[in-house]
């Protein structure tokens, strides 16, 4: 069931809004958190652009049925752009009975829209993970 959750009007409110959207476990609800030009980067480093592609990636996480935990490490703001470094985890037993211990550090970018609300422009959940030769 799609729920319209509030977006943040301040940079400091981005993470609480993100967590509420993520833990809805609803792809359509979470898609409302993304900028129209947004993208998500998968664990292999591939960028998925557009609502349909982002939705497919989100569905993989939401299928676990777990609530995400997030600790904000850094928030830097320059005008209408915010850089976030977030430690996150999915820990528990997935819907299929699999034990999950997924922990990573995200490097994300949010942008304030013309309506004054912050949305994710770049969602890079495995941002600090080394992905091979540069």
Question: Which residues make up each language-model segment?
Answer:
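Short glycine-dipeptide loop
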Residues: 36
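A beta-strand edge to alpha-helix "cap/lid" segment located at domain peripheries
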Residues: 2-29, 39-134
């Amino acid at each position: 069931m799609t729920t319209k959750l509030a977006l943040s009007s301040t940079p400091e409110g981005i993470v609480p809004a993100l967590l509420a959207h993520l833990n809805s476990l609803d792809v359509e609800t979470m898609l409302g958190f993304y900028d129209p030009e947004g993208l998500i980067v998968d664990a292999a480093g591939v960028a998925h652009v557009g609502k349909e592609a982002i939705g497919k990636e989100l569905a993989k996480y939401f299928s676990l049925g777990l609530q995400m935990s997030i600790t904000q490490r850094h928030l830097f703001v320059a005008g209408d752009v915010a850089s976030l470094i977030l430690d996150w985890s999915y820990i528990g037993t997935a819907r299929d009975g699999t034990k999950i211990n997924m922990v990573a550090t995200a490097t994300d970018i949010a942008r304030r829209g013309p309506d004054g609300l912050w949305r994710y422009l770049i969602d890079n959940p495995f941002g600090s993970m080394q992905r091979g030769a540069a």
